[in-house]
């Protein structure tokens, strides 16, 4: 069993490193167009700022990891920095949660025990609330603060607004997921949603139950107009996300059916433009430069709220 844990840890680390493209970001702060991180202190002219909070993904469900995000993962969010809406300038705050650990830790994923205590997702919701309150104390109006996130960060975003609907202006969930590659592993495209999720429940009952608990909470309590981006070839929740359409006010965008947007092939870029590689996984489509096609949709969300 110890060898299995060792193998899985190395495997996850390898996957994380390949996604990182060698340009990891390991600290909180505002990001400039050149990916320079500035710590939160005083915000100049805060009433004329729009703050986007970025919640990164995770390399495991409940444990710590080596870094929070990377240049290739956050490039599209940075592309919005400096844009203005009604005279209000957009800033991007990268919120790192890589040092946070849930009460049951990384090993819970391999357990059949029901989850007890606060998960990493729960703690990330609290972390976001703390940051929002700090920004408000510095003079930024709540309606001009937007919580956003990719993958586990996307699910964090949905949970945040289901628990704290009046604390921020709005949010964006990119490829919300935190419970493994459900679509691919349980062959949802072949077996269908119901049978695929039944197999997930049979293999990982505790994890199935916690996912259901979170989804039910979101369906019941989420009332704030949000954006959600999904992709059918996302191996995580690409074919298991139709439940989002049941949420009043939710604007769900299914990005495309393949790895193109508006007829253009999609690539990810690292620190240098020469660090270019094709997108081969629908889970990363929101990180491909072609995704900037949707920047006007994202800016429109901000305009509606301010």
Residue positions per predicted region:
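Short, surface-exposed "cap/lid" segments of acyl-processing enzymes
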Residues: 43-85
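Alpha/beta-hydrolase active-site loop
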Residues: 112-138
């Amino acid at each position: 069993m110890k060898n299995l844990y060792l193998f899985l840890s190395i495997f996850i680390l390898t996957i994380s490193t390949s996604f990182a493209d060698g340009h990891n970001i390991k600290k909180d702060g505002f990001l400039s167009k050149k990916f320079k991180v500035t710590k939160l202190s005083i915000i100049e002219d805060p009433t004329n700022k729009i703050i986007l909070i970025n919640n990164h993904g995770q390399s495991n469900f409940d444990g710590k990891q080596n870094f929070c995000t990377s240049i290739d993962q956050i490039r599209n969010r940075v592309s919005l920095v400096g844009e203005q809406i009604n005279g209000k300038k957009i800033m991007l705050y990268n919120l790192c949660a890589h040092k946070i650990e849930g009460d049951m830790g990384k090993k819970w994923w391999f357990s059949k025990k029901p989850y007890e205590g606060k998960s990493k997702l729960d703690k990330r919701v609290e972390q976001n609330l703390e940051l929002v309150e700090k920004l408000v104390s510095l003079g930024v109006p709540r309606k001009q603060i937007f919580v956003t996130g990719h993958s586990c960060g996307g699910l964090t975003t949905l949970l945040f607004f289901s628990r704290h609907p009046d604390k921020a202006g709005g949010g964006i969930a990119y490829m919300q997921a935190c419970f493994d590659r459900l679509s691919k592993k349980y062959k949802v495209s072949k077996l269908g949603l119901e049978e695929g999720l039944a197999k997930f429940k049979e293999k990982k009952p505790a994890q199935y139950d916690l996912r259901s608990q979170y989804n039910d909470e979101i369906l019941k309590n989420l009332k704030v107009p949000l954006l959600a981006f999904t992709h059918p070839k996302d191996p995580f929740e690409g074919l298991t996300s139709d439940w989002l359409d049941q949420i009043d006010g939710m604007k769900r965008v299914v990005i495309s059916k393949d790895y193109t947007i508006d007829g253009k092939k999609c690539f990810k870029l690292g620190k240098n433009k020469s660090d270019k590689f094709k997108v081969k996984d629908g889970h990363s489509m929101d990180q491909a430069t072609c995704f900037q096609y949707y920047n006007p949709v994202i800016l429109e969300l901000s305009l509606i709220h301010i």
